From Swiss-Prot:
Record InterPro entries: bHLH_dom (IPR011598), HLH_DNA-bd_sf (IPR036638), MASH1/Ascl1a-like (IPR015660)
Subunit (UniProt): Homodimer.
A single Gene Ontology CC term: nucleus
Localisation per UniProt entry: Nucleus
Main location: nucleus
GO biological process, one term: regulation of transcription by RNA polymerase II
Region (Disordered): 1-46, 104-132
Alphabetized GO MF terms: DNA binding; DNA-binding transcription factor activity; protein dimerization activity
Name of the protein described by the UniProt record: Transcription factor bHLH126
Native organism: Arabidopsis thaliana
């Protein structure tokens, strides 16, 4: 007997099932890798959709912002960053304007009160002094829109009731948010808060002039 002869030739084939198992395992791994690739593709598509939606929403917001800005702040500027800077400058200018007009209003209120306390003509009563003052209208920007301040005599044909002021403002297509009236030395001061959707499109001086015409000039006050 040849000692080098393999007595069990099948023994060397016993490893084949092991090799087959390896092949089976490789097939399973390929399936898992395929599923992983599908998940990655789905995530990429989802991320792409979210990013596209975000850009559309931002474009809509910037378009809305441009409609609220006066032309002088964005004229000749196309970049979004320029529009944002224009909005910042507009807000700063508006805040400064509000402070300036508020200080002017307070000054006028103090002057009005002092004018009625001091009687320049001894032959006139305080009521007569009040009647000599014409009605006034002032329109100024406010945080939530506009503020309309109307001052008139508290009695007599020159008096401007709050109902008439509100009616005139609403005829201009403006929405009144709140209103209140104070009395200072026979004078009525109506303060009306008005909501404005597109502040940059309203000319404050034009609106003030129209209110003066409708409330004062048309009635001869």
């Amino acid at each position: 007997m040849d000692p080098y002869k393999n007595l069990n030739p099948k023994g060397y084939q016993r490893q084949r099932p092991f090799s087959s198992a390896g092949e089976s395992g490789g097939s399973g791994g390929s399936g898992t890798a395929h599923e992983t690739d599908d998940n990655k593709k789905k995530k990429k598509l989802l991320h792409r959709d979210i990013e596209r939606q975000r850009r559309q929403e931002m474009a809509t917001l910037f378009a809305t912002l441009r409609t609220h800005l006066p032309l002088k702040y964005i004229k000749g500027k196309r970049a979004v960053s320029d529009h944002v800077n224009g909005a910042v400058n507009f807000i700063k200018d508006t805040e400064a304007r509000i402070k300036e007009l508020s200080a002017r209003r307070d000054e006028l209120s103090r002057e009005t009160g002092q004018g009625y306390k001091s009687n320049p003509d001894p032959g006139k009563t305080g009521s007569d002094v009040g009647k000599s003052e014409p009605a006034t209208v002032m329109v100024q920007p406010h945080v939530s829109g506009l503020e309309v301040v109307v001052s008139s005599n508290s009695s007599g044909p020159e008096a401007l009731p709050l109902s008439k002021v509100l009616e005139t403002i609403q005829e201009k297509g403006l929405e009144v948010m709140s209103s209140f009236t104070t009395r200072v030395n026979d004078r009525l001061m109506h303060t009306i808060q008005v909501e404005v959707n597109s502040f940059g499109c309203i000319d404050l001086l034009w609106l003030q002039q129209k209110l003066v015409e409708d409330l004062i000039l048309s009635t001869g006050y």
